[in-house]
A protein has these predicted regions:
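Terminus-proximal functional modules
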Residues: 2-94
Length: 94
């Protein structure tokens, strides 16, 4: 009886970990000269809404001279592949 319960517990724990992945796509700018970029970054599960993700991403981006303009959306790992080409060098960089 203990083995099936343990197996189910492990499966549920692993499924919960996978579901907890959260990503945000965003637009940033840098002045002088004006440079605009689109990117994708992972954010913590607790910040998996556009407003909360903005609060997490803004300091990361600012430390490299970028100003966050907007967080377009938040999504799970299923949305990564379709955004990879558009994000280019800003794919999971920050």
């Amino acid at each position: 009886m203990k083995r099936p319960i343990l197996a189910v517990s492990i499966v549920l724990a692993l499924a919960g970990s996978a579901a907890a992945e959260c990503y945000a796509d965003f637009k940033v700018k840098r002045d002088d000269p004006l440079t605009l970029r689109y990117g994708v970054s992972q954010v913590s599960d607790a910040n998996c809404s556009p407003d909360a993700a903005a609060g997490e991403l803004a300091p990361r981006l600012a430390s490299d001279g970028w100003t966050l303009l907007t967080v377009l959306s938040t999504f799970g790992p299923e949305g990564l592949e379709e955004r990879k080409a558009s994000a280019g060098e800003f794919f999971l960089r920050y």
